[in-house]
Amino acid sequence: MAKIKFEEGIKKLEEIINQLENKEQGLDDALELFQEGVRLYRICNEKLTEAEEKISVMIEEGNQLVERPFEGGEE
């Protein structure tokens, strides 16, 4: 998988969405853009998953801070 920063992937994905919404390309070009968008989505989603696994939440129990794994939910 390509080494791409999350922010760069999101920016490229937004550009692809804008191009697809303009409907100015032919079917073959639109399909190619769609496939690239799916690839970028998967890369960005994987990076988010990796980041969530690294995040810990500090919870105060009594007078101590206890580290707990991040348990984020779907929006």
From Swiss-Prot:
Bidirectionally degrades single-stranded DNA into large acid-insoluble oligonucleotides, which are then degraded further into small acid-soluble oligonucleotides. It is found in: Cytoplasm. Disulfide bonds: none annotated. Belongs to the XseB family. This is Exodeoxyribonuclease 7 small subunit. NCBIfam families: xseB (TIGR01280). It catalyses: Exonucleolytic cleavage in either 5'- to 3'- or 3'- to 5'-direction to yield nucleoside 5'-phosphates. GO terms for biological process: DNA catabolic process. It comes from the Bacteria. Heterooligomer composed of large and small subunits. Pfam families: Exonuc_VII_S. It comes from Alkaliphilus metalliredigens (strain QYMF). Keywords: Cytoplasm, Exonuclease, Hydrolase, Nuclease. One of its GO terms (molecular function) is exodeoxyribonuclease VII activity. It is an enzyme of class 3 (hydrolase). GO terms for cellular component: cytosol; exodeoxyribonuclease VII complex. InterPro entries: Exonuc_VII_S (IPR003761), Exonuc_VII_ssu_sf (IPR037004). HAMAP family: Exonuc_7_S (MF_00337). Its EC number is 3.1.11.6. The gene is xseB.
